[in-house]
C-alpha cells in the first residue's frame, strides 16, 4: 500500500485530549492534527519525534490533517492510525501474503457472530473448508525489540478472545491476528504486565484451538505492507 498523495512531515509538539496533536512543520507553521488512536500510544508520541501526516480534501473537517506515522528519534517507524491494521491485513490476505490464511475464495468484513454479538473483523470462506474467523489487533508497544499487546487493560479484547474460543468449540477456524506496526519489533508476546487477564485468556484460547498469528509490516513514509511472520511467546 502506497500513500497517495504523499505524506507530509512535521515535528511533534504534544498530543492531548487523546484525539489531537500539535506539530510544527519544516517551514515553521504550527498545525493541529487529528490523532486516530485512542490508546496509550506509549513510545509513539514523544515530543520531538517526527510525525508523518495526511491531508483530507474534505472541507467540512475541522481538523483536515491526520497523524499517520511516527518516526521515533531512534529511527523506528510506527503506524499510529489504528485503521490501517485492518486495511493492511485485508490487503495481505487478498494478495495471499499470509500463507496461513491463503486458499479462501470469499472474504467478508464486520460479520456479526458469537453469544456476545460481536463483529468479527474478517470471515474467510471456501468450499469444503470450515469458515475462518479473524480478529485483528494493532501492535505498536515495543521494549527492546519485544512487541506487546495490549498497551492498556482491554475488556473489549478479552471479550473477543472469549468469542473466538466459542467459534473454535463449534468446529470453525478461529484466528487472532496481531498486525505489528512498529519497525523495531522482532517478536511478540501478550502484555502480561499491563493486562494479566488478557494474557491468561490468550493462553487459554490457544489451548482451546484458537490460532495466534503475528505479522510485521514493512513501514516507510512512502507506504506499508504486512510481510513477515514473527515468533509468538505466551
From Swiss-Prot:
Q: Point out the DNA-binding stretch(es).
A: 201-220
Q: Which family does it belong to?
A: Belongs to the SfsA family.
**HAMAP family according to UniProt:** SfsA (MF_00095)
Keywords attached to this Swiss-Prot or TrEMBL record, sorted alphabetically, are: DNA-binding
Role played: Binds to DNA non-specifically. Could be a regulatory factor involved in maltose metabolism.
Traced from the root, the source organism's taxonomic lineage reads: Bacteria, Pseudomonadati, Pseudomonadota, Gammaproteobacteria, Enterobacterales
| Gene assigned in the entry | sfsA
Q: What is this protein called?
A: Sugar fermentation stimulation protein A
What terms describe the molecular function in GO for this protein? Answer: DNA binding
Q: Write down the Pfam families for this protein, in alphabetical order.
A: SfsA, SfsA_N
